[in-house]
Each structure stands twice: as C-alpha cells, then as structure tokens.
C-alpha cells in the first residue's frame, strides 16, 4: 500500500470512529464534546468521500491487472485500466488539494480597513476607488458589505474606511489583500500631466467572538468625546464618540459614526478585538514562516504587495511576479479573482 493510500485509510478509520462516538449516549449527553466531535467529522467529511472512492479505484486497478493474464478478458481489462488510471490521477489531484492544511479563519467574516497613506488627497481618492472595487467583488460573490466607520477628506475621498463583509469564505479569498497598495496615475487636478505615486494600506481582520479573544476590562482605557464633522465642526452636542485603547498593546480604536455612545462603544470594541486577533495571526505567521518554503505575504500592513499603474493599464502583484494589463476592467468589474486565484494557487503550492 502506498503512503497516500495508508494516509487515506487512517482518515477513513477516524471518520468511522467519529460516527460511532457521535451516536454514543455518553457523547450525546455532553454538548461540548458533541460539538467538538461533530466539527472534527465535518472537517474530514469531504476528504473521506474522496478517500473511499480513491481506494475503490485502486482495488479495481489491481483486479483488472490480474485479468490481463486472461486471454479472453485482457483487451477489455486494458480499456478499463485506461479509464481507471485517468480517474486515479484526477482523484489524486483533488485529494492533494483537500489534504492542504485549512486555515481555521477561512470561513470567517472580516473587517476590511482601508487607510490613506502617502500621497495626500490622491491616496484618499484611491481608498474610495479600491473600496468600490471590493464592493463590486463582494456583489459578485453574493457577500454583504456594511460600512462600520468612514472618515472623508475634503476632495471626495476617504482618510479611512472600515467595513464588515459577511458571506461564505470571505476571509479565505480576501486575506491576501492585506498590505500596502501603491497607485500611479495623473490626478484630475494635475495640469502638467505628471504621474503621481501614492499609497494606501489594507488590513483584513477576521470577525471574532468573545471566546476567541478575551479582553480584561482593566486593560482598557475608555474615553468619550464629542463627535466632530468636516473642518472640526461639532455634529453632536453630547459626548457620543468613543476611543478605546488596549493598554498592553497600545492598540486604539475611535468610533463616532453612531449618535449613541453605547453603539459607538460596541462597534469600537468589536474592531479592537479583530485587531488584537489580527496581531495574533501576524505573530503566528512569523513563527511559522521558518518552516515554510515561502509565504505569499506576511499580511503586514507595511509590506508593499501591489501596484496599480493607470497610464499603462497595468496591475502588478509583486509577491508572485504577476502582471496584468487589464487594470481598468478589473477595477470597474470588481473581478478580483484574476489576482486572487493565482495568489491562492501559489499559497497552496507551498504545501506540496
């Protein structure tokens, strides 16, 4: 038996063990254990189905090879073997994909944070442009986008946008967007036609619950103040705006989009938890990087990952040396799969 067949046999054995355990009175009466084992079985269900089919194909190949000695059945066995070998190859490809370790955050919703960096107003305008592209992509994927917080600049762009994106596999596809995005284009206000370079940062933070990130209330500094509008004008006569600082890490979140102090505090706390969880992920990735051939990217906000060159209609993905000359089409259609699919394929190849 090959190493792959042995591995698949052990997976099937575990699946059958879990089936038996889940029907036992002891497990049924223990909700925590029942949930834990159900989750484990669900995580190996797809690979178990493929394993059963693969082992069956191996058995059929073995039987047909034995029939090659039979003069009457040898031709039929040869034809059957051709079909079985193709099926075996296809199943091996699919199984290798299924055996790649799954990121536990892949099924989570995310907080998407875009922030203007170098380049002044032009950076803020690109924050809006890239956010629209993400919204179009979310629409294609049937995801829901909810703006949690936004801060506009004076020329119709944004200093910062934070949005909650909900749907199937959101984190699995957008996690590679974290980092610095550089844009090169001629601003509308540029009379000399000179190309300006500006940059924005993108953060992708999995939505987390209280179990995943526990915060001690004594570690929080909560400040309230009056919400300010454009140009410093006061938009609220009560102290509804909230700033929460996590003292051990000095991570701070301000929120003033809601009229209610309670709602602003609730939103700020959720984003703070997401940022703390993001920090945990970054630290874990750095620790794991030593054991990996190469990472697609660390997810560090300071890492320059992509350049959008409008005069050349060029999108350059620096982590995998991908260049596409369809920038405007991608931005207008929101079809980011042209970039995301190669990134996912590259990440998966590191486990092969």
Swiss-Prot record:
- Leader sequence segment: none
UniProtKB keywords:
Cytoplasm, Methylation, Protein biosynthesis
Provide the protein's localization: Cytoplasm
| Residues modified as N5-methylglutamine | 233
Q: Where is the composition biased (Basic and acidic residues)?
A: 289-306
Which HAMAP family does the UniProt record give? Answer: Rel_fac_1
This chain belongs to the protein called Peptide chain release factor 1
């Amino acid at each position: 038996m090959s190493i792959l067949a042995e591995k698949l046999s052990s997976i099937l054995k575990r699946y059958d063990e879990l089936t038996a355990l889940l029907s036992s009175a002891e497990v049924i009466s223990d909700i925590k254990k029942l949930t834990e084992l159900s989750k484990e079985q669900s995580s190996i269900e797809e690979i178990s189905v493929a394993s059963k089919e693969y082992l069956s194909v191996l058995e059929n190949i073995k039987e047909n090879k034995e029939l090659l000695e039979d003069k009457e059945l040898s031709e039929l066995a040869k034809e059957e073997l051709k079909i079985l070998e193709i099926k075996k190859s296809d199943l091996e490809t699919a199984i290798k994909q299924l055996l790649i370790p799954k990121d536990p955050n892949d099924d989570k919703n995310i907080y998407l944070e875009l922030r203007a960096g170098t380049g002044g107003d032009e950076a803020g305008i690109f924050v809006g442009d890239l956010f629209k592209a993400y919204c179009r992509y979310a629409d294609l994927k049937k995801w829901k986008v909810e703006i949690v917080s936004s801060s506009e600049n004076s020329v119709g762009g944004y200093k910062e946008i934070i949005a909650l994106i909900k749907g199937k596999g959101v984190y699995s596809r957008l996690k590679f967007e974290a980092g610095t995005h550089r844009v090169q284009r001629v601003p509308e206000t540029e009379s000399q036609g000179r190309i300006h370079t500006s940059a924005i940062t993108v953060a992708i933070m999995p939505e987390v619950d209280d179990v995943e990130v526990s915060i001690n209330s004594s570690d929080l500094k909560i400040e309230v103040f009056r919400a300010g509008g454009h140009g410093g004008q006061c938009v609220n006569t009560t102290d509804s705006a909230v700033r929460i600082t996590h003292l051990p890490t000095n991570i701070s979140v301000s929120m003033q989009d809601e009229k209610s102090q309670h709602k602003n505090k609730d939103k700020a706390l959720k984003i703070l938890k997401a940022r703390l969880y993001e920090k945990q992920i970054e630290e874990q990735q750095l620790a794991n990087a030593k054991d990996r051939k190469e990472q697609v990217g660390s997810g560090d906000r300071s890492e320059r990952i992509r350049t959008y060159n409008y005069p050349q209609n060029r999108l350059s993905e620096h982590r995998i040396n991908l260049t596409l000359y369809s920038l405007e089409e991608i931005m207008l259609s929101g079809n980011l799969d042209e970039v995301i699919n190669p990134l996912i394929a590259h990440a998966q190849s590191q486990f092969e």
